Amino acid sequence: MSVPSDPNRLAPDAAPTRPASFLDAATYGLAPNETPLLDDAPTPTKSSRLDDAATARFADVYRRLVAEIEKAFVGQRELVLGTLVALFSGGHVLVESVPGLGKTLFAQALGRALGCRFGRVQFTPDLTPSDVVGALVFNAKTQEFTFRPGPIFTQILLADEINRSPAKTHAALLEAMQEGAATVDGQTHPLPRPFFTIATQNPIESEGTYRLPEAQLDRFMFKLVADYPSADEETQILVEHGKNVALSAKLDAIRPVLAAEEVLELTSLANDVYVAPQLFDYVVKIVRATRDFPRLAFGASPRAGLALVQGARVLAAFRGRNYATPDDVAPLVLPTLRHRVILSPEAEIEGRRVDDVLTALLRSIETPRL
């Protein structure tokens, strides 16, 4: 999610705006060894129903969750932050990456740190909807059919390589994500709460993959891109592996920061973070701009605006504030929109990247002063 070296190349007359990246320290005016994830400087309090104690609790929970996850999982801080923002926003995430970058380990570590049950489904071409949500099985003793829950009945679900299965299979998962329940033979079965899905997909160019329909992609709050680790992170991975400590032992060292009920409580509290009218207008302008912006053939739905606002609330709370600002919206633009827009044929012929086009779009929107 890095900002292009020359983003104005796509929009020569664009006005400067805030950076569209979680962790690009240079664009935040920070030194490389500083972090833009949490604001250290005191900020004035604005009208909000979220009190100071709750705000401080959010920031503390974020720090502790990251510390626990890092006991087993190295690097990928954008993945960690984006996932936590989506989780406490009540959304789900789609993660695109090549195999071998530790996505399963991350999901397991997240489940441990949250005190939630973890489940995993490996999507394959022959996987059926009943393999995911469950099925009715005949009980010989009672001479009745009983429901046998599928692996989806957990709290933190890793849906691995979702684009390797046909549409009807991942459609069953996406329906459950939307409704919070699974329907089998006309009977509705509620899923545990909280229910959070981390779906992964290989790059679409990979062999044996199916392109997810736009309507299904829209159900994911964020699309996060997990890139290869930096040289320092890769060295740390090798050093940790050389200590001959089993992954199970590292996971066992993770202590729950929250209980499942507290996850639900904080998710509800995030709604109380104040959003100024000017910020609502800013989000609407960004989303509407995708529908007629050069090099975009298909724009984002209103669901994108809902995701931006709710994500900004949570990011502000993680940063220790009870009100959101444009600096909480801008970093979420790429993960919120990159899977909700389609490049025009001309842009594809020119080899444009969707992130570059969206960054230019963001720079063309005037940033409000609150």
Task: Tell what function each PLM region has.
Residues G82-V85, F138-A159, Q187:
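Conserved alpha-helical scaffold flanking the Walker A/P-loop in AAA+ ATPase domains
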Residues T55-L101:
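Pre-Walker A (pre-P-loop) alpha-helix and adjacent loop at the N terminus of AAA/AAA+ ATPase modules
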Residues T146-Q155, V184-Q201, L212-M221, V225, ...:
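AAA+/SF3 P-loop NTPase mechanochemical coupling elements
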Residues A54-A59, A72, T209-Y210, D218, ...:
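Conserved C-terminal "switch" segment of AAA+ ATPases
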Residues T154-Q178, P192, E207-L217, Y228-I237:
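Conserved AAA+/SF3 P-loop NTPase catalytic/coupling segment centered on the Walker-B
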Residues L87-T124:
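Walker A/P-loop
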Residues A86, K168-P190, F196-I198, N202:
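Conserved catalytic/switch belt of AAA+ P-loop NTPases
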Residues L23-P32, P36-R49, A56, T290-L370:
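C-terminal engagement/docking regions of AAA+ P-loop ATPases
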